[in-house]
Amino acid sequence: MDINITLIGQMITFAIFVGFTMKFVWPPLRKALDERREKIAEGLASADRASRELEVAKRQSAEILREAKAKATEIVENAYVRAHKVDEQAKEEAIAAADKIKSMAMAEIEQEKVKAKEELKHEVVSLAMAAASKIISANVDEQSSKKILKDFVEKV
């Protein structure tokens, strides 16, 4: 093996080249690779975070939708109950008003009935008095009395 000056010169030049590359070229290259690695890691972490946030948002939106449906159902049921109560109340009020009108009509009928009885009583009394006075005033026999009473009964 012949080692000559050229080979030594090439070795020295190669060593200087390696030293120069290690000192000036490798650090910026390494820095660029590290930055690229960090950006990729951040992108993956961000995508993972976004995926988790999306799942949370989906669950929250599903929960909100479920609550909204439950609330809507409750509102509809409350409206139905309220409408039913209003309907029942209106029916009860109508029945009460009808009962009141009926009782007032019955009371009025009863008053008219009492009034008619009183008028009839007064008329019967006056007719009886008239018949009695005719019987007394007329010196009549039994047949005449019967005829007067028969006429009186027909009038009544």
Curated annotation (Swiss-Prot):
Topology in the lipid bilayer: Single-pass membrane protein
Domain of life the protein comes from: Bacteria
Residues that span the membrane, as ranges: 5-27
Main location: membrane
InterPro entries named among the record's database cross-references: ATP_synth_B-like_membr_sf, ATP_synth_b/b'su_bac/chlpt, ATP_synth_F0_bsu_bac, ATP_synthase_B_chain
NCBIfam families found in the cross-reference section: ATP_synt_b, PRK05759.1-2
Protein name as it appears in the record: ATP synthase subunit b
Species annotation: Francisella philomiragia subsp. philomiragia (strain ATCC 25017 / CCUG 19701 / FSC 153 / O#319-036)
